Every structure is written in structure tokens, then in C-alpha cells.
Amino acid sequence: MRTDAAGGTYLDPSAADVTALLERVHLVGIGGAGMSGIARILLARGRQVSGSDARDSRTVLALKAQGAHIALGHRAENIEQFDGDPTAVVVSTAIRRDNPELVAAQERGVPVLRRAEALAALMADHRVACVAGTHGKTSTTSMLTVALQHCRLDPSFAIGGDLNESGANAHHGDGGVFVAEADESDGSFLVFAPSVAVVTNVEPDHLDHHGTAEAYTEVFQRFVERIEPGGVLIACADDAGAALLADQAEAAGVRVRRYGHEVTADGDARMVGYRPEHGSGVVTVEVSGDRLDVQVAVPGEHMAANAVAALLAGLELGAPLEGLLEGLAAFGGVRRRFEFKGRADGVRVYDDYAHHPTEVDAQLRAARPVVGDGRLVVVFQPHLYSRTAAFSGEFATALGLADEVVVLDVYGAREDPQPGVTGELIAESVPLPAERVHYEASFTAAAPLVAGLVQPGDLVLTMGAGDVTMLGPEILAEVERESGATEEDA
């Protein structure tokens, strides 16, 4: 047991009593991507689950239908939804220390678990595969999960996005394998002990928590040290940060498999070609002397690299090659990862979660072949004041790959505003003619603005980790209103 500065009781997730605590569980912020996944698995395992969230949502309604007792708003009495106190309260890093439910749990001596600690306890008695990296975690974890499902291995999984196939971000399976997205943002992935660890890339981010790029890199080094004896690190050799990790791990005696364009060792996956197809692609890979064509059902070379990582991880988990290839070809994508939202008057609208300059760059390059003869119109909402201040120039450069850019104001999430840090900081540096770059501080004015800019054949891409995802349907409605035409989704 340990106590933090706020007086909360925390437990070592490797201890046997942590799993025993997950009987009557209250989750603060249960509607979030990570917390809802834990709730789904607990419910599937027959545990009692209560929770709270700031607002109603599709996720909250789905969890209620599964049997969770959920209150809207945060109040101390919300933890009293069981007969007696909960056996544990689970919180995410988004929950402030003065949250009344967290305070009530601390005052009553109810054990408090961080989200990752609860997830680690759910992994007990499973062979664990964790996917980490600055970018590509959700897509790679999802590809691996779907590929294993096609091999009929029925993995348990917890992902930071909803699979389009099932609409779920988590599942309790009977296959003895647990696949999880490992979030480095607060360092909490250090509680996991995977036998298969994937690192897609390492590039400075979340400096609001880690402080420096060096500290951010160090937390990945510590994650690799958590790999179980006899386990394997799968790392992207094309990324400098991941390649350095791989070299360090190998020197420490960890078995390493690399993927990328220049790898040469037996067991590595060398990507020797990529052919884009409409809305998808094919990557040619050489592995242990075999040459494979891997069909990837989502566009972009970055997605092809993610698929190769998933392929190697699946092989390490004992899945058959043919089944993995079939699963990757059938992969239906993840919600908010270049997700098609609809079409109106010849204008297609997609939505994507990209919120780091490298992600924005990769997704715009992937979208370009899909655009065709029209224009690529991007609506970008910066996420976090700290990230906007640190990377405004890089964001501007990446957005210059579009034909028309609308930059919204910053979605602050957990952060307070910073003087002088707005979306305009990015917009004023986008390397496009001024008439093709628009800063719109009013969220409600964004959809009418975009509808007035687009023409038939254009592709609109809303982009960011905040509530910009809500704009897609509004843009479609505005386009229909202006044109007087309605088209069926395609």
C-alpha cells in the first residue's frame, strides 16, 4: 500500500489483493475512453459497477444497458450506489484531486486505484500484449485485436477507441490473451508487464506532465524494462526514438524484432513497397525470407506500418499467418481514425483524432489519394494549451499540406488558458495564401464557415482530440441547407 500527496490509498497492482478489490467498483468519469473499457470488462466478468460522468453519452447509455449504475454529475453520494461502500474507486488522470467522489473515498478509507492499475489487475492470468508509442497506439492495438479475432483466439482487449466492427473499446474474451493500448501520457503504463510489447514511435509529447523531452523518452525506456523475462519488443526501426529503444533493449538482453524499410536481421519485417488503393493499401513485406503482400483496409503508409507491427505481434502470440493476413485485410477501422461521416452535395466529410504535428502530417498525406480531383479542406482544433505553445510552428507546417485550412480555438481539456496561446498562433504561420487559411474562434460559427468554402468534389477532414468531432454532422447539414440537395451516405 502507499499514500499519495492527496491522502489517497493506492495499492501495488501486482499484489494479489488488488484483483480481490475489483468486486464492487465505482469509476469516476466512467464515460471516458479508458474508464468505459474497464467498466465493460468488469461487467462481463460479473462484477458490480457504478460510476459517474459529467454528461450523458452514447457510452454511458450502453454501460447502463449492461447493468452499470451511473450518476450524472460529480457528488460525494455517488459512491453510495451499492449496499455498503465500494471495494475500490477507480480514477483517471483527468479527475482533479478535489473531485467530491475522490475526496469521499479517501475520507472513508476506500482504496483508490488509478485507471492503469485497475487495468493491470484485470490482466492477471493472461498473456499480455501492450502497444505503446506517441502515435498509432489505438490503430495498431485495434488491428492486432481484430486480426486475433479472425484467428478465433477471442482475446480480451482494452483500446482507446471504438472498433467499427463491434462499436466497443473493450471485451472480456476466453482466449487467455489480453491486448491493451498502453498510454504513456502520465507514465501509468509502467504498471503493465507485457510479454509482447510494441513501440510504434517515440517523439516528445505530453510535456505538461513529463516536463522535458528527455524525461518523456526515459519513461519509454522504463516501460521496455517491464517486459517479462523471455518476452519480446517489437519496434519501428524507421523512427529514431523507437530504434534507439530497440538498440538499448537488445544490449540489455531483451529479444527484439524490428519493422521498417531498412531492417536486415532474420525475424525482422522489411517493408519493401507500398501501393495505395482507393481507401486502402497494400504493403509488401519480407519476413524471414518470405515475401508477403499485406492488405491494409485503411489508407496511408503510417497505417501500413501499424499493420506490420500488428502482424509481428500476432505471430509472437501464436496466431497463424493466414488468419492474421485475413484479419488485417478485413479491419474496419476505429472510430475517429479517418472515419467517414457522410456526404452532401458531392462533399465528403471525414473525422480524425490526430492532435500532434506528426499525426496531422501523416493523416493529410494519407488523405490526399482519397481526395481525387477535389480539394482537401481541413478543420483543425488544437488540443491543450501546452501542446499548442510547444508545437505551433510544426502544426502550421503540417497543415500546409491541405488546400484550405480552418483553425479553431484551443480545446483546453484539463488545462487552464495560457495568455497569447490560441488557434491563431497556428493559423498565422500556415504556409498557404492568406485567403486559404481561416481562424475561427467561435465553435458555433465553424460549420457555416466551412459550408461556405466547400464545393462538390471536396473532402473535409475535421481533426483534433477535442469536441471537433461534433462538427462533421453540422457541416453536412449546413452544406445540404445551402445546396438544397441531400445524398445518401456512401
Curated annotation (Swiss-Prot):
It comes from Saccharopolyspora erythraea (strain ATCC 11635 / DSM 40517 / JCM 4748 / NBRC 13426 / NCIMB 8594 / NRRL 2338). This is UDP-N-acetylmuramate--L-alanine ligase. It is an enzyme of class 6 (ligase). Cell wall formation. It catalyses: UDP-N-acetyl-alpha-D-muramate + L-alanine + ATP = UDP-N-acetyl-alpha-D-muramoyl-L-alanine + ADP + phosphate + H(+). InterPro entries: Mur-like_cat_sf (IPR036565), Mur_ligase_C (IPR004101), Mur_ligase_C_dom_sf (IPR036615), Mur_ligase_cen (IPR013221), Mur_ligase_N (IPR000713), MurCDEF_pg_biosynth (IPR050061), UDP-N-AcMur_Ala_ligase_MurC (IPR005758). Pathway: Cell wall biogenesis; peptidoglycan biosynthesis. Gene3D superfamilies: Mur ligase, C-terminal domain, Mur-like, catalytic domain, NAD(P)-binding Rossmann-like Domain. ATP binds at G133, T134, H135, G136, K137, T138, S139. The lineage of its organism: Bacteria, Bacillati, Actinomycetota, Actinomycetes, Pseudonocardiales.
